[in-house]
Curated annotation (Swiss-Prot):
Molecular function GO terms recorded: aminoacyl-tRNA deacylase activity; ATP binding; leucine-tRNA ligase activity
Name of the protein described by the UniProt record: Leucine--tRNA ligase
Organism, as annotated: Desulfotalea psychrophila (strain LSv54 / DSM 12343)
InterPro entries reported in the protein's UniProt record: aa-tRNA-synth_I_CS (IPR001412), Leu-tRNA-ligase (IPR002302), Leu_tRNA-synth_edit (IPR025709), M/V/L/I-tRNA-synth_anticd-bd (IPR013155), Methionyl/Leucyl_tRNA_Synth (IPR015413), Rossmann-like_a/b/a_fold (IPR014729), tRNAsynth_Ia_anticodon-bd (IPR009080), Val/Leu/Ile-tRNA-synth_edit (IPR009008)
Keyword terms of this UniProt record: Aminoacyl-tRNA synthetase, ATP-binding, Cytoplasm, Ligase, Nucleotide-binding, Protein biosynthesis
Family recorded in the similarity comment: Belongs to the class-I aminoacyl-tRNA synthetase family.
Sites where the protein binds ATP: K588
Length: 827
């Protein structure tokens, strides 16, 4: 125990000291302990781009505070970190810098790990993983094979972006305004084989289990419900004229089916080619389809394109009324949704209404508001609400909801339709024609067909390039990788050259953290059972659908493969706000980026952490403020000065007084009120900003104990409050609090201490503030004892000098007392 003599807190020396201590002692390494309640805290792992940004600082600091708090509450805390390391940016950087993606990636990981350690984050670095490591994706390849054997993976032809100049497939991210990012030549769609995960097999469970996720923001659950998009309605076939084929449609509004006046097909619909083959419209329709597909590449996905279509020259028949219905190809029909064919009812669908107006197609109202007549010529927009049916055969006069059920039953009875439940969700296409991804463990044999790579031959590794000219060349351009032997028949065969979507790696990494060095299987079942599910997951709302939905899917698959016993991966989810400056998100293009490295160098990690926690609640955006950072630094130095100025009193070792003076009682009460407020703010909603504010009030109270530079509170009462300040702030500013804790003579680091408990009796105030109203208007306030009777409060209120002015001798009709809050005097 040594009296600190520096005028200011030396953050550089102290932070380096404690970071070294934590690393050498593996302070935050953890193993399973059946005698302790586990708590698994996880933030979404980062892509190793090269440097952390303020969004990382905020996200990871929030998680670190929770992890440190839970440790002090006695939990066995798992708090791991790793790297989502595959992806397109590494390929781009490797080509730009004439290096290999693995070199670029691991260099970035080394630098970013150092940055995270400089923030004082309490990670179990023994569990660190990079998804580009063959030891990681070897287990992923085994999962692929097990899913294939269970019927959860299949191969089919799909449409991709193709560049003729580069002779390669491009990811959507590589297509810029319809052109190849590399050669700037026009990209066009091409059909190719691709691998798919059957996520639709789990659509109903994924939807139903959202109701279990009560610890998730409702916004995220709603987004997933909408993405899964369950619909119930009618599946119905429209027979094509002069052809054996039928057009199958699905509609959620069977009550409008008598109003069909044309049929719309997606440009990619397989029937389009059959409809136009050998007709005088063949070339015109093909040109239109080509134009629409190219326009799709260029268009802004947030903008609604102009509706365009072309008549195929063919007709189909409405099975309900026998109407002859022209068949169009339309740019607003998507092959991914429904059947890729839409029965068009312009009177009751706005897109169809606009299309019909443009191409002079009939508009036939069949559902109208009760008691109203509708003239199609007078319609300015589609009638989309339910109502009563007209022009609908035997169903005329029925209400929409009643008619829907009867129309479906009629179609089923007649054999041209049936009830159907559909989902907007589509199977997950995981094939990527990139180099920097996990190879798909499949061999193609002319004799045996599709053959999984034997488990004992995993991993299928990416080829390493000695020739830098071939860095990142797609696998289909590498004969040394492609050519192999069939494990079944021993004949020459070829490897699959697609790699997996990088979302695959991030869909199960949280489970792998429970046994990251396990080599016998993707997961150690016993360890997974102990740690999972994740108790608290933290990340941006931009991942609400894809990553979070895929992780839920993988959890259910891992359960069905026998690895897990849980249904959902994340019990609670916090989607933190962005860090913004000048009203917009920080970005290089806007020139408003604040580099955490510079901030830590100037102010230290603890100040950086404190600002990121104090400036806003975690779920809201944080507005950058230089003044806020400086204020956080001043606050820590204020505590430091208090401890150094009162070092002798704080380390005197006096016993806590049996009888408290008035000053002691005030400080003691404030101390326990602060413990209560901070505990509740962290425990209930992670509102660290109000928790820090409460500690600031306690620090102010500490300074208020001094008159003429001498404490009027007993040293032991003073020390108890200072201990609370350090304990309560330690999850937020761990270096500073550890150092001050040891300076005050403690022998064990602060993270080994229990979280302070509050005495509920000690938090209670002696006096209440009662508001006095006269005729409902506030006229005065009085202080009264907590245990005062109501009639005594009324007497004091009536005697109050300010109230007397407003009563002015008038007779009092009655008094109304709201317990412990106010008295209203009615005159």
């Amino acid at each position: 125990m040594q009296h600190p003599t520096n005028a200011r807190y030396d953050f550089k020396t102290i932070e380096s000291k404690w970071q070294k201590n934590w690393a050498e002692n593996k302070t935050y390494s953890v193993t399973e302990d059946e005698d302790k309640e586990k708590y698994y805290l996880l933030e979404m792992f980062p892509y190793p781009s090269g440097r952390i940004h303020m969004g990382h600082v905020r996200n990871y600091t929030i998680g670190d505070v929770v992890a440190r708090y839970k440790r002090m509450r006695g939990f066995n805390v798992l708090h791991p970190m790793g790297w989502d390391a595959f992806g397109l940016p590494a390929e781009n950087a490797a080509q730009k810098n004439n290096t290999h993606p693995s070199v670029w990636t691991y260099d970035n990981i080394d630098y970013m790990r150092q940055q995270l350690q400089q923030l004082g984050l309490s990670y179990d670095w023994d569990r660190e993983m990079a998804t580009c490591n063959p030891k990681y994706y070897r287990q992923e390849q085994q999962l692929f094979i097990e899913m294939l054997e269970k019927g959860l993976i299949y191969e089919k032809v799909t449409t991709v972006n193709w560049c003729d100049t580069c002779q390669t497939v491009l990811a959507n991210e590589q297509v810029i305004e319809g052109a190849c990012w590399r050669c700037d030549q026009l990209v066009h769609p091409r059909k190719m084989n691709g691998w798919f995960f059957k996520i639709t097999d789990y659509a109903e469970e994924l939807l139903a289990d959202l109701d279990k996720l009560t610890g998730w923001p409702e916004k995220v659950r709603t987004m997933q419900r909408n993405w899964i998009g369950k619909s119930t309605g009618l599946s119905c076939d429209f027979q094509l004229e002069d052809m054996d084929d039928k057009i199958s449609i699905f509609t959620t509004r069977p009550d409008t089916i008598y109003g069909v006046t044309f049929m719309s097909l997606a440009p990619e619909h397989p029937l389009v080619e059959q409809l136009i083959a050998g007709t005088d419209r063949e070339q015109e329709v093909r040109d239109f389809v080509k134009e629409v597909l190219e326009d799709k590449q260029r268009q802004d996905p947030t903008q609604e394109p102009e509706k365009k279509g072309i008549f195929t020259g063919k007709y189909c028949t409405n099975p309900f009324n026998g109407d002859r219905v022209p068949v169009y190809v339309a740019n607003f029909v998507l092959i991914e949704y429904g059947t890729g064919a839409v029965m068009a009812v312009p009177a009751h669908d706005q897109r169809d209404f606009e299309f019909a107006g443009k191409y002079k197609l009939p508009i036939i109202p069949v559902v109208v508001p009760e008691g109203e007549a509708v003239n199609p010529a007078d319609m300015e927009e589609a009638l989309t609400n339910h109502g009563l049916l007209i022009n609908s055969g035997d169903f005329t006069g029925m209400a929409s909801q009643e008619a829907q059920a009867k129309i479906i039953a009629y179609a089923e009875e007649k054999g041209f339709g049936s009830p159907l439940t559909t989902y907007r969700l589509r199977d997950w296409g995981i094939s990527r024609q990139r180099y920097w991804g996990a190879p798909i463990p499949i061999i193609h044999c002319d004799s045996c067909g599709i053959v999984p790579v034997p488990i004992d031959q995993l991993p299928v590794e990416l080829p390493e390039d000695k020739d830098k000219s071939s860095v990142c060349a797609p696998l289909h351009q590498r004969p040394d990788f492609i050519n192999t032997t069939c494990p079944k028949c021993g004949q020459p065969a070829k490897r699959e050259t697609d790699t997996m979507d990088t979302f695959v790696e991030s869909s199960w990494y949280f489970a792998r953290y429970t046994s990251p060095r396990h080599t016998e299987a993707p997961l150690d079942k016993a360890k997974a059972k102990y740690w999972l599910a994740v108790d608290q997951y933290i990340g941006g709302v931009e991942h609400a659908i894809l990553h979070l939905l895929y992780s839920r899917f993988f959890t259910k698959v891992l359960r069905d493969l026998g690895y897990l016993e849980i249904d959902e991966p994340f019990i609670k989810l916090l989607t933190q706000g962005m860090v913004i400056k000048d009203g917009t998100k920080m970005s290089k293009s806007k020139g408003n980026v604040v580099d955490p490295h510079d901030l830590i160098s100037e102010f230290g990690a603890d100040t950086t952490r404190l600002f990121s926690l104090f400036a806003a609640p975690p779920e809201r955006d944080l507005e950058w403020s230089s003044e806020g950072v400086e204020g956080s630094s001043r606050f820590l130095n204020r505590i430091y000065r208090f401890i150094t100025a009162n070092f002798e009193a704080l380390t005197a070792g006096e016993a806590f007084p049996k009888k408290l003076s008035e000053e002691d009682r005030l400080l003691h009460r404030k101390n326990h009120q602060t413990i209560k407020r901070v505990t509740e703010n962290i425990e209930h909603n992670f509102h660290f900003n109000t928790a820090i504010s409460a500690v600031m009030e306690l620090v102010n109270q500490l300074f208020a104990q001094f008159k003429n530079e001498k404490s009027i509170a007993a040293p032991a009462v003073l020390r108890a409050s200072v201990d609370s300040v350090l304990l309560l702030l330690s999850p937020m500013v761990p270096h500073f609090c550890n150092e001050m804790w040891m300076v005050l003579g403690n022998t064990e680091p602060i993270e080994n201490q229990a979280w302070p408990e509050f005495d509920i009796e000690a938090t209670k105030e002696d006096l209440l503030t009662i508001i006095i109203q006269v005729r409902g208007k506030v006229r005065s306030k009085i202080q009264v004892p907590v245990d005062i009777e109501e009639d005594e409060i009324v007497a004091l209120a009536l005697a109050d000098e300010n109230c007397q002015k407003f009563i002015d001798g008038q007779p009092i009709k009655k008094t109304i007392v709201v317990k412990k809050k106010l008295v209203n005097i009615v005159i």
